[in-house]
């Protein structure tokens, strides 16, 4: 069981601020969590191999190769209207004025 004083100290360390009536609820909930952790600590798992994944599938890795990442030409291919050519040249989107 966590005392109210311990709950206040933990809350302060976690930079949490509680009302006075909430501290009791927090200490009860924190005590319950600590009880659950104690139950987990009692489990004997020394003969169990640790898991890195719940499935036995191996992740397919892509080849680590350098590729071109300049997508600006593809991005500006979608620009339409009178200013499309200028937008492609200066590599900026040209929009109507929104602030006067």
Swiss-Prot record:
Q: Which GO terms describe its biological process?
A: regulation of translational fidelity; translation
Does the keyword Nucleotide-binding feature in the UniProt annotation? Answer: yes
> What are the alphabetically sorted keywords of the record?
ATP-binding, Ligase, Nucleotide-binding, Protein biosynthesis
The keyword Coiled coil is assigned to this record: no
Top-rank EC class of the record's enzyme? ligase
Under catalytic activity, the entry for this protein gives: L-glutamyl-tRNA(Gln) + L-glutamine + ATP + H2O = L-glutaminyl-tRNA(Gln) + L-glutamate + ADP + phosphate + H(+); L-aspartyl-tRNA(Asn) + L-glutamine + ATP + H2O = L-asparaginyl-tRNA(Asn) + L-glutamate + ADP + phosphate + 2 H(+)
Q: Which GO terms describe its molecular function?
A: asparaginyl-tRNA synthase (glutamine-hydrolyzing) activity; ATP binding; glutaminyl-tRNA synthase (glutamine-hydrolyzing) activity
EC number(s) given by UniProt: 6.3.5.-
Annotated TM spans: none
Q: What domain of life does the native source organism fall in?
A: Bacteria
| Subunit and interaction comment | Heterotrimer of A, B and C subunits.
What NCBIfam families does the annotation carry? Answer: gatC (TIGR00135)
> What role does this protein play?
Allows the formation of correctly charged Asn-tRNA(Asn) or Gln-tRNA(Gln) through the transamidation of misacylated Asp-tRNA(Asn) or Glu-tRNA(Gln) in organisms which lack either or both of asparaginyl-tRNA or glutaminyl-tRNA synthetases. The reaction takes place in the presence of glutamine and ATP through an activated phospho-Asp-tRNA(Asn) or phospho-Glu-tRNA(Gln).
What's this protein's family per the entry? Belongs to the GatC family.
The protein's name in its UniProt record: Aspartyl/glutamyl-tRNA(Asn/Gln) amidotransferase subunit C
Q: Could you tell me which species this protein originates from?
A: Rickettsia akari (strain Hartford)
Gene name tied to this protein: gatC
């Amino acid at each position: 069981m966590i005392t109210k004083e311990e709950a206040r100290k933990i809350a302060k360390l976690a930079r949490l601020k509680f009302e006075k009536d909430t501290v009791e609820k927090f200490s009860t909930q924190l005590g319950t969590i600590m009880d659950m952790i104690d139950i987990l600590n009692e489990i004997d798992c020394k003969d169990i191999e640790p898991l890195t994944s719940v499935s036995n599938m191996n992740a397919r890795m892509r080849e680590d190769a350098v590729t071109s990442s300049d997508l600006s030409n593809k991005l500006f291919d979608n620009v339409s209207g009178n200013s499309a050519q200028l937008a492609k040249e200066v590599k900026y989107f040209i929009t109507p004025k929104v602030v006067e």
